[in-house]
């Protein structure tokens, strides 16, 4: 999630006639069991939702902007209806979950609005047998009293979704269906972008879903309540996981790129640029020369990092290890953009 980072036309100011058969969602096959669904939304977030099809359950990693379409003329704006009725070319022209034949299991990578908006997640929690999984790292962060703020819904003046988390995930928890059968998915706490951020390791397809922890060619944001120190720790953690999983070059290399760029920032090798957030509050911006990586956040977060001997020693040590270690590989990281 990153507000306004996709330069596209704004939503149409007036309603247009509905175009039959049109939708704001598009789906393509990522691998043997996983589909990537992109939502063309009016907030210009273009959230990516991942759908994994199992014999016993239909897993969704995030639920997007709830059909808040950029194009007001599209007919189908319900994610659930799209999954249950819309023919997908990469699925033999069949819907991904025809008629809702499989129960839904939703994993929230974090609680920002473009991952949980009312028209999305609420469609699934109202169904008997559906479950919602989220991080137990900081339960209060996801409480109904704080969610309007932590989700950023209040900043955009949009309704905060109402849903119950049925499964609070501890770090390293295995995801199971309602019968207790393992799905080959493991949830890891990766706080930093938000306290509740998680990554999901798919051991069958050898893919690591990183949520909004990192992007290519789009800013990585640090808003209020977020921490560059915790983020750095999570990047280091994911690098260790990738090595343990005998991860593929694209996964290991990109994580190393993010880690190295952050190191260059906190050691003064990258020039700071002044910018502002959507409320007009000042923030610092750091962009790699090729534009492939960018960090934005309150300058205090970066200064806090520089002042922490433990944080600086840890990231410096990882750079030394990177210079002396090469890993064999056979898996990949899935990025949200």
Predicted regions and their residues:
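Short, basic/low-complexity N-terminal boundary segments at the transition from targeting/disordered tails
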Residues: 1-17, 26-29, 106, 153
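Active-site HxH/HxHxD metal-binding segment of metal-dependent hydrolases
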Residues: 67-181
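Short acidic-hydrophobic surface loop/beta-edge motif
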Residues: 26-30, 52, 171-180, 286
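Short Pro/Gly-enriched beta-strand edge/turn motifs at strand-loop
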Residues: 8-9, 30-36, 152-158, 180-185
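Short Gly/Pro-enriched turn/cap motifs at secondary-structure boundaries
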Residues: 25, 39-41, 160, 164-166, ...
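Conserved beta-strand hairpin/beta-sheet module of binuclear metal-dependent hydrolase folds
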Residues: 20-95, 200-212
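Accessory terminal helices/loops
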Residues: 2-11, 16, 240-337
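Metallo-beta-lactamase
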Residues: 58-60, 65-75, 180-279
């Amino acid at each position: 999630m990153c507000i306004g980072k996709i330069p596209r036309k704004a939503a149409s100011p007036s309603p247009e006639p509905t175009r039959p058969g049109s939708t704001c969602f598009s789906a393509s096959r990522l691998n043997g069991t996983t589909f990537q669904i992109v939502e063309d939304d009016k907030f210009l977030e273009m959230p990516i939702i991942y759908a994994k099809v199992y014999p016993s359950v239909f897993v969704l990693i995030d639920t997007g902007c709830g059909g808040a379409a950029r194009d007001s003329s599209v007919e189908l704006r319900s994610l659930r209806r799209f999954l249950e009725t819309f023919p997908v070319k990469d699925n033999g022209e069949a819907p991904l979950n025809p008629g809702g034949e499989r129960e839904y299991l939703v994993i929230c990578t974090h609680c920002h609005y473009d991952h949980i908006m009312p028209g999305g997640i609420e469609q699934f929690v109202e169904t008997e047998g559906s479950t919602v999984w989220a991080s137990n790292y900081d339960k209060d962060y996801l409480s109904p009293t704080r969610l309007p703020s932590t989700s950023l819904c209040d900043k955009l003046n949009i309704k905060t979704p109402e849903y119950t988390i049925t499964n609070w995930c501890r770090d390293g928890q295995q995801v199971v269906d309602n019968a207790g059968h393992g799905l080959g998915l493991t949830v890891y706490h990766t706080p930093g972008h938000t306290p509740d951020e998680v990554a999901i390791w798919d051991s069958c397809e050898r893919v690591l879903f990183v949520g909004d922890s990192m992007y290519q060619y789009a800013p990585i944001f640090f808003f209020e309540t977020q921490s560059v120190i915790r983020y750095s720790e999570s990047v280091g953690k994911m690098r260790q996981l990738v090595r343990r999983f005998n991860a593929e070059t694209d996964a290991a290399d990109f994580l190393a790129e993010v880690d190295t760029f952050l190191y260059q920032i906190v050691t003064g090798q990258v020039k700071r640029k002044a910018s502002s957030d959507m409320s007009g509050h000042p923030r610092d911006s750091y962009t790699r020369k090729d534009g492939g990586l960018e960090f934005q956040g309150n300058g205090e977060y970066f200064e806090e990092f520089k002042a922490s001997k433990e944080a600086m020693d840890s990231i410096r040590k990882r750079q030394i290890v990177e210079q002396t270690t090469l890993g064999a590989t056979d898996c990949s990281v899935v990025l949200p953009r």
